[in-house]
Structures are given as structure tokens and as C-alpha cells.
């Protein structure tokens, strides 16, 4: 199952905000059994957001977006989502109750900016926001699932946590382990990485992440990961590959790891 | 001038690594006068990287990528770049000298993994890497500029710093300032934001970033920014819009800011 992550917001494009949301979602979905195949960041513009949802729908089984769900003029995600799906935008009664109850508690009136957060594409299901006000949006379309979340990290995380049990890919497990290799240049470790990949072709993925300075002070973190239908099996494959890697790296530099 | 940012690496898609590179590049390019219009993250797969470069070329004047320049099997960026541009991949003599001199210093041989880092599309210019080994790649194609940088942040930043003077958009300035508004819900501030946008239509951009809890403890950071051909003018526009915003916000809650 393939997942696609969309981040909406000019502040990300301008580098004003680091996109920790995409990383969080990527992590959660990977461990939920998905292959995250693409992430995109688009501005607060309808046509760009529409493009992102359509690109996601053409490539993945699950699309998760963050940002653009609030009460301001540049919160355009649900409008764009409706357009991307050719669905009508309507006042969702369940979402309206959620939004209303939040403001009722404070005794403030429901202005059009507040009611805006209860509009959703026809057929969408609002997801309660335990932290903030704007509900998340869940919709199924052409066999694909779309989850639209707020951009505030605490709100995004809370709604995603709630939705996760339904999103998890049944019988699909991911496992990952890393080993830090010191005193071997990444270029010298490359043939070892290649060999371990060959020995476990299609079963594990090995990637080296240089953390030091290639020539003067080489430190390489090697990540080994696997996905499969048994938790025990993927863990076993990763551990065996790590063992192969460490034994070969030690033959280059016995103090490496 | 429009810029497009590509991040290459499975570790970003899996959320193992937070994409600080894209934020850094977005920030630097915004202040260099670009509109960053899209960011994408793609896996270490040729076809996906080719797609990203082509999507960038079809939309932007400058494309900056990070990741996939190293010595390992999954460093595929230059190969994909050559394919995206329909150019031959060749051993770049200038890049070869750069790579060779790094390893010569240590007296180690130039294995094929090390020489790999000197291959570039025909016509590309290598950019010296003062921190690591793999040179950056600069190439002009169909009136567009492409800058390909390593994924290690210190290396990426150093090469980008060096390249920046040539990339800067002449006579284009960006300025941004923020004000923190307390005790006014984002939904109550929305009409104020709208009004300030209307008063300065096309001149400034105003975006509210909720930082607290909408109903119980509202804290909203309002960002005002402008781009234009005079540094003084954009600064003046932003400061005037901030003044309008603060005066209107204070009429809702005098202690707000």
C-alpha cells in the first residue's frame, strides 16, 4: 500500500517553518505498513492544492494532507479537496455540531469564519479535533482514502493517532535498525553495503547516512530496514543483515563498530 | 522568478530524517528574491528523480535538489538528472580533479565508488565541496538553472553559500516581520487579517499561524511579508501593515500585543 503526503502552506515553502509534520506522518505511516512514495509541499492556492490531491490519487492508496483547515481566507484545503474530487462542498452537520459545541462552551457567536471550518466535500466524515477547533476530514474516493489534517502539529498528531487503527495495513510490518560505523569512509563502506544488499536481495534495504567528514573523520550511520508480513521475520532479516555488515566492516577496521 | 526544491532520499519519506535541508533552501531562496512554488520529496529511484527534475523544469526558473550525490549504489541523482535533460553522463574532468585531490591527500586509491562522484551530465559545472567530497552540480538547460547539492546539511549549506551570489534575483527584495497576538482567537482575528490584506491588496501577504489553543488560550503569530524592487519600500509596506493590524487587534483586546 502506497501513501502520499501533502503539506499545504506558504510558510513551509519560504522555509519559515520546518516541515516536521511530514516527517511525523511519514514515520507513523511507515510503521503502519505503508510505503511513503512521495511528499509534496504546495502554497495556499486552490489550483496547487488540487494538483497535489490529484497527483496523490493517481499514485497512492492513502493521501494525508496537513494545513489549510483553519478559519482564515487562506485556509483553502477543503475547497480544493472538493474540487479535486469533483464533489460539492457542503456544510457538514456533524462537523458543524463539533465546531458549534467548541464555541458554545465559551458563549461566542458562530461567525462565518468559524462556520467555514464545518464545510466539507459531500460524503466526507469529520474527525474530532481534541486539541483545537477545525475537525479533520476523512473521505474515501475511487477506492482511495484521503485524510486531511490541520497544520498545527499537536492537532495533526492527535487526529492522526485516533485515525491510525483504521489506517493500519493489515499484516504488514516494518522494522529498522541502525549501526554507527566509525573510521571507514562511506566510499570504502559502499562495496560492503552493496554486498549486504546482494546477499539479502529484495529482503532488506541498506542505506548509509554520512554523519562525519568522509576523509578526515568518517562516521557513517548505516540503516537496515525491512517490510514483510511477519513482525518476527522482518526483525530477523534486519538483525542478520546488520550482523553481516558489522562483520565485513570489522574486516576493514576492527575498531569500527 | 520561481524556484522549485527537490529532496531525494528514502529516509525523508520514512520520516527518519526531518527535511531541514528544504527549509534552509526555501529560506535562502526566498531572501534571494525567489518565489518558492513547490517542494517535492522523492525516493532514491531513477524514475522518481527524473519526474521531479522534469516537473521542476516545467514550472520554475531555478531547481535546487539535495541528496543522492554520494558514492553508494543508491546515490542516483546525477544519473537521473542526465536522463531528465536527455544529456549524456560523462566523467567530468574538473570534478575528477576535485575528487582525486581529496583522496590523494590521504593516499588512498580512487575506487569506482569514489570516481562515481565525478560523473555529471555533459555541460555541467562541478561546484567545489569545501566540507565533504562529492562536488555539487550546476547546469543550465533551456534557460533554466539547476543546482544539485549533497544531502549532508553542512555540505549543502557550504556549496549553496558559494553559489548564492550568482543565483540572487537582481533588484528583488523580500522582507518579513511577525507580531504575536494573545487573547484573540484566530477565528476572531480572521476578519482583521482579511481587512489588512484588502487595504494592501497585492502589496503585502498576511498569514496567521495559530500557536496556542484557539478557544482556551489563543496565541496567534501573524506574519506580514512583501516582495518588491526596493528594499526600503518592502520594509515600509510591511511595517505599515503591521501597524494597521496591531491597531485593529487592540480594538478587540487592548492587551493583545
UniProtKB/Swiss-Prot annotation, chains A, B:
Q: Which SUPFAM superfamilies match?
A: Molybdenum cofactor biosynthesis proteins
Q: Quote the Pfam families the UniProt record gives.
A: MoCF_biosynth
Task: Report the sequence similarity comment from the record.
Answer: Belongs to the CinA family.
Q: What is this protein called?
A: Protein Cmaq_1209
Source species of the chain: Caldivirga maquilingensis (strain ATCC 700844 / DSM 13496 / JCM 10307 / IC-167)
